[in-house]
């Protein structure tokens, strides 16, 4: 259980997806603070700005203009004060290549964007309530891609 | 080097020859000596004979004088005195001859001296006899004395002459005996020596003719093989050259000239001509390689272009090796290949490969479009529909609710189609990594993937033991999912589905029409169900993409599932067949190579 509101950051260029995401967080009963960036450049600027509080979980779309999600991921993992942020890849693609690449680059979980709003809520709930310390230590290729029971 | 026959006999032949020649030389020297000896002995005989004659002449001259004197004394006719007058000269002539003949013989000289003294005394006695027989000075007693003395002198002369003759004879005998001894030793010896030499020569003649026969045979073989080599060189478009590093001589095979576009033996090759026809681009590298041969005594493959006199460019590949022949000279054996055809084919293949790569890339980008860009709007349609809450639906008209449901099912169908198409194209394009896994494991994975529907339909799946095979694991798992899923989907409405899966090993020769014959053994995996089955006339068409036997309202599906199965099995060089009896069930048989 979290004492303070979780700080969530979504990097996604798609307006509709940001809307779904926002609505889903509003409907689940967990206290969260959700903010958005629209592309990779904006994301990196946001993270590098010391005035901004670092997110607890970053939801990262792969297919973004200016700087792709993969580039951001690599950059984040190379930066000392950012590398411990929990990163959930949040993408339409479910290609083996993307899953493999992001796993190797150190993302914590891979979420394929669902096509049902209720499923989205379930996924967000799952990701937010997971004990990340426990999950990260047991992370492997099989449980990297999030599958809802 | 094995291909040069070894004539060991040549050395022993040489020895035999030398021996035979020496024997013959020896024999001829003996013959020469014999000849000399014979000559010597005949000269000796002549010598003795001459002395003998001269002595006889001397004797007869004195006798003539004696007879003439006697006749004169008796008759007092001066004509009887003529032989007496001449005898003195005759004696002197013979004496000079004898002196010459016995010049090398001291005892005979002394004898001759004594004889001369005796003869002189005899002539003095003649004078005395004539003096005392003359009527003017006649003295019977003195005449008798001198006549008698003359007689004794005569006896002495005869004795001396005989002695001299004897000495000569003895000497002759002695010499002849020595020669005889020398000669009598040899005939048997020389004949046997001659026979030995003859047999040696015969022996070597036999050996020579035998070697000659062998040489002829090898020569014939060499001719045949060199003919074959030059024939195969022109058939195989390769050529050979030999570079004698010691004498720096280079030999080209006939085909080498032909490969260069020239008549055979049209020039005498040397180190410079090796480079003459090489394309200017490659001259430097080939020259370097040639220098490398001398250092490393070896030539790794060199690829280069040559320009023929008619300016046609050909592609060459050259290799070489240093060999040492029987005489110990170092020869670099080089082989040139004209690889122009292969090279051009290679270029063509490379171009085709590039085209293939390009089209593969296009396919991959199409996949990306399908997986990402096409799904994006679809996903949004579905999400927005899911956001239409039940409360929203309450206020909607019946027809509006109906449209929403229809949009929902169409969108769902679109998603299934896209997913299946993606799956189908991925069975082609994704990397095919073969790993040895247990098929039983893959099957149980497939079952757990289908657990929901299996439970829902209360299906029973019976599996016999499946082998461990080298396969692309996720594809075979997909194959099992599709086949079992298919059976579950087309089960009979009132009967609980039963699927039995069995496996056996078969020989490809038992299925000559459908199986790859280069692979000997296959695993035949049979999926038998008790479902509704299909008309056997469709047993081929059901594997074709988008072919459906049922309406999509009764059985939702894309018509891709079995096409994927076929693709997967083909990826494994296997085969899949289907058979069915309508209303009784279907059998799908998968053949996978061992």
Task: Go through each PLM region and give its residues.
Chain A
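Active-site residues of response regulator receiver
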Residues: 60-61, 91
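Short, glycine/charged-rich "phosphate-handling" switch motifs in NTP-dependent
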Residues: 108
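Receiver (REC) domain active-site loop signature in two-component systems and cognate sites
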Residues: 64-65
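Acidic, metal-coordinating helix/loop segments flanking the phosphotransfer/catalytic sites
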Residues: 36-57
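CheY-like receiver
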Residues: 119, 124-125, 129-149
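A Lys-centered signature of the CheY-like receiver
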Residues: 113
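Conserved acidic segment of CheY-like receiver
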Residues: 5-26, 58
